[in-house]
Every structure is written in C-alpha cells, then in structure tokens.
Amino acid sequence: MSEAEASSGMAHNAGPDEKTLQVLRDMANRLRIRSIKATNSSTTSYLIPCSNAEIMSVLFFYTMRYKQEDPENPDNDRCILSKGLPFVNVATGWPGQGLGAACGMAYTGKYFDQASYRVFCLLGDEESTEGSVWEAFAFASYYNLDNLMAIFDVNRIGHSSSMSVEHCIAIYQKRCEAFGWNTYVVDGRDVKTLCHVFSQAAQVRGKPTAVVAKTFKARGMPNVEDAESWYGRPMPKERADAIVKLIESQIQTNKILVPSPPIEDSPQINIMNICMTSPPVYVADDKVSTQRACGLALAKLGHENDRVIVLGSDTKNCNFSDIFKKEHPERFIQCCIAEQNMVNVALGCSTRDRTIVFAYSFAAFFTRAFDQIRLGAISQININLIGCHCGVSTGDDNPYHMALEDLAMFRAIPNCVVFYPSDAVSTEHAVYLAANTKEMCFIRTSQAETAIIYTTQETFQIGQAKVVRHSDNDKVIVIGAGVTLHEALVAAAELSKEDISIRVIDLFTIKPLDIATIISNAKATGGRIITVEDHYPEGGIGGAVCAAVSMEPNIVVHNLAVMDVPRSGRCNEALDFSGISSRHIIVAVKCILMT
C-alpha cells in the first residue's frame, strides 16, 4: 500500500460492517448474472463485468455519491466506463480513451467548479498498451488531480491472447508510481479491501490515485474463469443456465444499498445564448490571418462568459491562442504535444454542460485524434475544435504542417458543423456561432494574412453562404472559402478587364452547405461552377458541391484543388504551384466558357 494508508479519517469512518460487505458481495454476483444473461442473448459473449463485479459493486453502492433519480446532477460523482449511459457521459469505444475524458471532468471539478464531486475511471489492463493512457497519466499528475481515481482491472486476458505482463501486478504499480500517482495494489475480489482503499484515496491530497486490482476474467464461472478461449464466444445455453444457478446459490440476501447523496456545492452556471455584445473592430484596410482573428475572438468571447475555456497543444505562440491565455490565464489548459489526450480532456470538460470548450491546434495534428473525435460525436458531446495552418497557403512551413485532409475528416463526422471563414470578421462570427451550437464544431483557419471582405455590421448564419461579387452578366460561379476566396476575387477583377463577369460565392460553412444558394446562382449563370480549395480534392469543397447539385440537370462542376504533395515556399508561390491561384482560376474560367 502507499503513503495514503497512513492518512487518518475515512469517507466511511468505521468502514463497512459484515452485513454491508455481504450485500456488496451479493450485488457483485447479481451483476455477474446480468452480464451472463445479457451477453448470452447476443451472438458474442464479452463477460467483462464478471472480472470487475466487486469493483463496480463497491464503487457504485459504497464509494460514489450521487442521486440515482438525477443522473445528470452536476454534484454527482462521475464514472467513466465504455458506454454512453446515463451515469457515463462519454463513449470510449476502443480502449485507451476513458482516462483522458476523466481527466477533463476532474480538471473541471477541481479548478472551474471547485466542487466536491470525484471522478472514477475503470480501465482494462489491455488499455495500458495504449499511449493515450499515459498521456492522461502525465496530465493528471502535472495538474495534481487528487479528485481522480483510475482503477486497473488486471485480469491478464486480452482480445486474442494473454497480456504480455499477465498478472505481474508490480509492473503496473511501478508504472503508475513513475508518473507520480498515489498507487494501491489490491485483490479485486476482496470487497473489504476495496472499500478501505477507495475510502482512503479520498483523503489523498495533491496527486491522483491509481488502484491496481488483480482480477480474473469470467470470475465465478467454472471451467471458464481465467480461460483464454472464451473471449467473444457465445456460451451454450445449458452451461450458462448452470452457471447462473451456481452464482444464485451464493447470494445470501435480497437487500440493496442506497448510494450516499452528493455534496451540493457545484456553482450554478449558464452557458446558453452568448451574445456578441459589440461588433468586430476591423477596418477595410486591415490584413489579418483568420487564425489570428480566431485568437482575438476567443479572448473576446472569454469576457462574455467565464465558462469559456481553451485547450492547447503547445502551439499557442503559433496560432494566437496565447491572446486568450494572457487575458484569461486561469481558463487556458496546456495539454502539451498530446493531441489525443487534448481531445479527450476537452470531451470530459464539456460533459454536463459545465464549460464551453475550444481545443486549438494545428489542423494536421487532429488526424492523430480522429478516433477520439468520432467517439465524441457518438457521445453527442459539444466541443469546438479549431484547426490552424490549413492548406498550402501555410507557405514556409513544411508539408507535414499543411492540413489538406481535415475537411474530409470533419465532414465525415455526424452532425459536425464545419466552418471555413474567409476573413477576420467572418472568423469572429464563426467563433460565436460555434459557442452557441450544441453540436461538435470545427473551424478551419489559415496562416496567410488576408484582406477584410465584410463590414463589421455583416451578419452570419450556419448553413448560409455569401454572394460576395455578382452582376447580371455573370457567366460562371467560382466558389471558394478561406484564401481561395481572395484568389477568386482577384481573378474576377482581372477577368472584368476582358469583359468577362464571374460570380463569387463564399461558403462560410462547408457543412451544412447552402445548397439553395449554390443551385439558384448556378442556374442564373448557365450552370457553370468552378470550386477552388486549399485542400486535396477528396472530401473537400468540390466533393460537397458536386454532391449538392448531383440531381440537378445542366449543371457542371469543375474542381481546382491541391492534386499532389505540396512543397514549401511563399504563400503565393505555393498556391500557384498547387494550381489554385488566381492565375489558374482565370485559365479555368476561360476554358469552361470555350466548351
């Protein structure tokens, strides 16, 4: 045992009596029975709860404080498992994601809510091979999350074979302690010890707690317990019925335990309907990158509501999130270069509507966290992700930093709103709209400094495009966003000198797409559309527009996109090299008019 055992005072002063311990054992066996019946009714058999039944019994009916009738109560203790259930706010899916979300919940409880609720996360031993687990371990230790407990269910069996370290509990203990966690080693079947350790952990200050519990897969099931051959296999009904009867014979009481009520000390908050109390302050002659405008907008938003928080991955000096940090230092969370954990922490912070979360990093690096992002959508979590350094317009940076796949990635996420602002004014509106949107949002920003297109009085809506240049003589529509919109406007000005008029549309949101505006303007210009995007052709603006007009006769779409791996260079050189500069737009317009 660790130093925590020397602490005096326990959450349950005298510990549980023998009657309570027996009830906890009986409840664990009822969990086993329900697990067997539930999994045996499907075509596979994942008897995971059989190994951790005692842990769950003690956790939910002795240690945790919550109101059963009010699972979303902000004062309830939190628990992270692998399903999105009333008491489990985050779907974690494939192993390795739950602890990061638990870190976000614990950080919110300790530093933002400053409340008494605690956070518990149950992990399988197989999860310990995931790097994201240790990203979370480092985060929790650095921020002294003493309201967080991670419980390892070490049953030694993985999906297809035993774990490499099997039941070498000391290895898990050393790893946890190396990250600065208060660590206990316990027999996961011993409810008395579990009660004692869980209570002692509540007294530890200044560091998170890890409980390494030795357990056995399919615990309590003769000829199945600790066997490697049963993972994922359906169990014959006769055997399952016999095992259920055996476990039922071990239950001595029908009593149940009622959890202790939570300590009601979470603050009342309001994160709804945040208004832009003053318009953007840019003037027509300004040249501002959208990622700088995003940093300024976040800082401004932070003054509108004190529950706005920003998470960074050690890129604040590159993407201007340091502006927010300077003005609201207590609400900026440095997650370091650990993007998977940053997204998981963001998911945890946003649960139960306790904060308005923005996670800001290079858009290219969000590819590392795609699994976390897609599971955030499954959990229906409201987080806002901001990607900077998008496209070849990043220029002098190398291709590794140039996000050219991000639109495809976020367009594939269900119910995700994808913003692509083209100037500082529209960027500020995108930030405020995202803050008020109860779905996942992605804001795509660029490094290139661009002109101000819109007046400070312009209004924006999700799914509403802007026709920024038009005339009655327009022959072609050019659709762009971000830097390519500016290239389209340059091309339009040059073409006008040759008496060629084109219409220019700014999409603003790529998802949802303003299909009505696209189709109506296409019909008014002879059904000719050119899309221009600082993105690979797959999954970007061109694909979205093609899908939108696919059922419309007599509309033709030509797509200009980055067709190959880019090179470093000045912004204008990179755009021209990739075939998406104003020069290439002019050529495309003339070609389409000749056909």
Curated annotation (Swiss-Prot):
Reaction(s) this enzyme catalyzes, per UniProt: D-sedoheptulose 7-phosphate + D-glyceraldehyde 3-phosphate = aldehydo-D-ribose 5-phosphate + D-xylulose 5-phosphate
The organism's place on the tree of life at top rank: Eukaryota
Protein EC: 2.2.1.1
Tissue expression as described in the entry: Not expressed in the embryonic neocortex.
Chain residues that bind thiamine diphosphate: G93, W94, P95, N155, K217, E339, F365, H401
Binding site for substrate: H389, D397
Principal location class: cytoplasm
Entry's Gene Ontology cellular component terms: cytosol
Family: Belongs to the transketolase family.
Assembly information from the UniProt record: Homodimer.
Protein name: Transketolase-like protein 1
Organism: Mus musculus
Gene name tied to this protein: Tktl1
